[in-house]
Amino acid sequence: MSLELQEHCSLKPYNTFGIDVRARLLAHARDEADVREALALARERGLPLLVIGGGSNLLLTRDVEALVLRMASQGRRIVSDAADSVLVEAEAGEAWDPFVQWSLERGLAGLENLSLIPGTVGAAPMQNIGAYGVELKDVFDSLTALDRQDGTLREFDRQACRFGYRDSLFKQEPDRWLILRVRLRLTRRERLHLDYGPVRQRLEEEGIASPTARDVSRVICAIRREKLPDPAVLGNAGSFFKNPLVDATQAERLRQAFPDLVGYPQADGRLKLAAGWLIDKGGWKGFRDGPVGVHAQQALVLVNHGGATGAQVRALAERIQEDVRRRFGVELEPEPNLY
C-alpha cells in the first residue's frame, strides 16, 4: 500500500478553524492512484468518505467516523499558449494563492482579484470562489473529476458544472464527484476588474493610474490582510455567511426601513445584500463568548480564540442568523460546509 494513512488522527492541523476533532482514518492522496486506493479502502471498511483540501471552508462539529481523504496532489502547467488565450492546468491539491501568483509571474491575467483566497485548486470550483467582482466561472475552462459510483473519469466544461453563487454541481452532489485537476483560461491581455471601491481607491492613493494585474493582486492581498485574520494566529474560515439575495419588492421595503442599506444590484433585478452590514447592524462585530467570537474588523468572520468546539461556533452562527432574521426578515446561509 502506497497510500499514507493515519488512524484516530486529530484534524486540528487540517482545518483553518483549528477545531480539534479526530478522524477514524486520514489518508493523504498525492495522485489518482492514491485516490482510487482510498476509495477501495473506504468501501472495504464500510466507512463513508470525507474529502478535504485546505480545510478552509469547513466547520467540524464532531469526531469524523469516516475516512478523511486530504487531496495533496501537486502540479501546475501551461497546457496551450495561443497569443491572447492561455490554458493552464493545476492538480486539485495545489494551494490556491501560490497558483495565482505562479500565473501572474508568467504574465497571465485573470486570477488577480482572487488573490489570497485560502484553500486548494480542487475546492475552488466546488464553491465557485469569488471576490472583488470576479468568480472562478469567469475564467473556468474545464476540469477532470472521478465518478465515485463507477470509478470512471469525466470531463466537465463550464456549463456542465452548473456554477451559481458559491455553488456548483460538485457542492450539490458532494458524495459523487471527486475533482482531480482544473483547467482555467487566462490571458496576456489584461482586462482588469476595478469595480470594487477600496481596490480602486488604494491604487489611486499609491498614484497608480494604469495598474497591472500584479498591482491589483498586491493591493487585494493588502486589503485582505487588513480585513481578515490569519488562521495561523486566530482560527477562522474567512467569510462565514453568503451575501443573501432578495427580490426587488423586499429590497425596496428594506431600503425604506434602512436608508443606509448596503447592497449590489444584480442583472436579474435582485439585490445582493452585504451580509457583513446586516450582522454589524446587530452590534455583533467584536462580540466574544468564551472561546468563540466575531472578528473586530469584519463582522462576516467568526473566530476561534482557542479551544473552541465546532458546536460552539455553530451555536454562535445560529444566534447571528436568528438576529438577522428578526431584524431584517432575511435568511443568512453559512458558506462553510458543516460536518
Curated annotation (Swiss-Prot):
Pathway entry: Cell wall biogenesis; peptidoglycan biosynthesis
Keyword vocabulary terms for this entry: Cell cycle, Cell division, Cell shape, Cell wall biogenesis/degradation, Cytoplasm, FAD, Flavoprotein, NADP, Oxidoreductase, Peptidoglycan synthesis
Highest taxon in the source lineage: Bacteria
Protein name: UDP-N-acetylenolpyruvoylglucosamine reductase
GO biological process, one term: peptidoglycan biosynthetic process
The enzyme's E.C. designation: 1.3.1.98
A cellular component term, taken from the record's GO annotations: cytosol
Source species: Pseudomonas aeruginosa (strain ATCC 15692 / DSM 22644 / CIP 104116 / JCM 14847 / LMG 12228 / 1C / PRS 101 / PAO1)
InterPro entries: FAD-bd_PCMH, FAD-bd_PCMH-like_sf, FAD-bd_PCMH_sub1, FAD-bd_PCMH_sub2, MurB, MurB_C, MurB_C_sf, Oxid_FAD_bind_N
